[in-house]
């Protein structure tokens, strides 16, 4: 049993057994871990994936914004420095500096970008220069608009004034016509009353005065300012006709009164007119002062008949007239 091969066998056997047990334990532990990982691992990993998926677009966007802002700021700084130093290149010189080959796509793209940047700067400068000019042009545009508004207000005021005057003038014309119409009959009545009450010597000056007053009224009413000439002519014509109508009955009445006074003073005076017609004319003149007796047309047959009748009646008239005169005394 103390032989060396047996000792190695005994040691190797123990090592082999313990090593095999250890290896089996490791395998079991690994299997269990993998089994637990299959159960618990997917939920955690999915949650982490979802979180990464949710966070990545926002992070990318913010990062892109930040980078774009930084790049824009850098370009602005470069352009400011170039402006301050006067290093802004012209459009043709940029392409010459990059590449002599005109068909190079990269150089052409770069020149386009540079032109865009230079164009933006030029626009900014032009806008800053145009702002005061625009404000000045706005002020200039406002000044003529104000003048036009003032002119329009003046025109509207003049139009309203003309309309008001035109609305007033017809009323004044109507009132003048009514006053003249009311004045003409009243004047005629006053003239007739004066003829009835006063003798012949006082009638002539009063009639002339009344006619002068009527003429004064007509002239004052027709010569008003603002009345057209056609209306003034019409008024003058109507007033002349009214005055003629007033003058005609006064002449007839004076002739009748003269004959009546001559009979009263001297009853022996012969007159071809009948006294009844005189009395009738007295009572009729007060009621119808404006009427004028129409002129009788004379025919030879009627004149002969009337002459024969008048020759028969003179004696009767002479007898009747003294009696009436005595009664009046």
From Swiss-Prot:
Residues recorded with modification Phosphoserine: 152-153
Family (UniProt): Belongs to the SPATA31 family.
Compositional bias of kind Basic and acidic residues: 293-320
Transmembrane segment boundaries: 11-31
UniProt name for this protein: Protein SPATA31F3
Subcellular location: Membrane
Keywords, alphabetical: Coiled coil, Membrane, Phosphoprotein, Transmembrane, Transmembrane helix
Cross-referenced Pfam families: DUF4599 (PF15371)
InterPro entries: SPATA31F3-like
Stretches the record annotates as Disordered: 149-184, 201-250, 288-329
Basic residues composition-biased segments: 232-242
Topology versus the membrane: Single-pass membrane protein
Encoding gene (name): Spata31f3
Originating organism: Rattus norvegicus
GO CC terms of this entry: membrane
Coiled-coil segments on the chain, per record: 58-85
Polar residues biased stretches: 154-184, 201-223
């Amino acid at each position: 049993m103390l032989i060396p091969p047996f000792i190695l066998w005994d040691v190797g056997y123990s090592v082999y057994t313990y090593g095999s047990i250890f290896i089996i334990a490791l395998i079991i532990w690994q299997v269990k871990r993998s089994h637990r990982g299959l159960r618990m691992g997917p939920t955690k990993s999915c949650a982490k994936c979802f979180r990464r998926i949710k966070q990545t677009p926002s992070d990318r966007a913010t990062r892109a914004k930040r980078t774009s802002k930084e790049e824009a700021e850098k370009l602005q700084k470069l352009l400011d420095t170039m402006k301050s130093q006067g290093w802004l290149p012209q459009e043709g010189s940029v392409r010459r500096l990059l590449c002599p080959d005109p068909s190079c796509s990269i150089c052409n793209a770069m020149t386009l970008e540079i032109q865009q940047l230079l164009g933006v700067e030029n626009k900014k400068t032009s806008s800053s220069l145009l702002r005061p000019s625009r404000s000045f042009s706005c002020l200039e545009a406002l000044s003529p608009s104000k003048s036009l508004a003032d002119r329009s207000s003046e025109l509207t005021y003049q139009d309203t004034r003309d309309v008001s005057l035109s609305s007033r003038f017809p009323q004044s014309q109507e009132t003048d016509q009514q006053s003249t119409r009311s004045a003409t009959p009243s004047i005629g009545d006053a003239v007739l009353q004066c003829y009835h009450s006063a003798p012949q010597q006082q009638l002539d000056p009063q009639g002339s005065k009344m006619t002068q007053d009527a003429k004064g009224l007509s002239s004052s009413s027709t010569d008003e300012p603002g009345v057209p000439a056609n209306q003034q002519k019409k008024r003058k014509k109507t007033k002349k006709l009214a005055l003629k109508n007033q003058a005609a009955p006064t002449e007839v009445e004076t002739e009748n009164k003269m004959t009546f006074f001559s009979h009263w003073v001297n009853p022996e005076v012969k007159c071809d007119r009948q006294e009844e017609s005189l009395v009738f004319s007295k009572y009729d003149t007060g009621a119808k002062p404006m009427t004028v007796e129409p002129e009788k047309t004379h025919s030879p047959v009627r004149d002969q008949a009337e002459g024969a009748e008048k020759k028969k009646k003179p004696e009767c008239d002479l007898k009747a007239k003294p009696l009436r005169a005595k009664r009046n005394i």
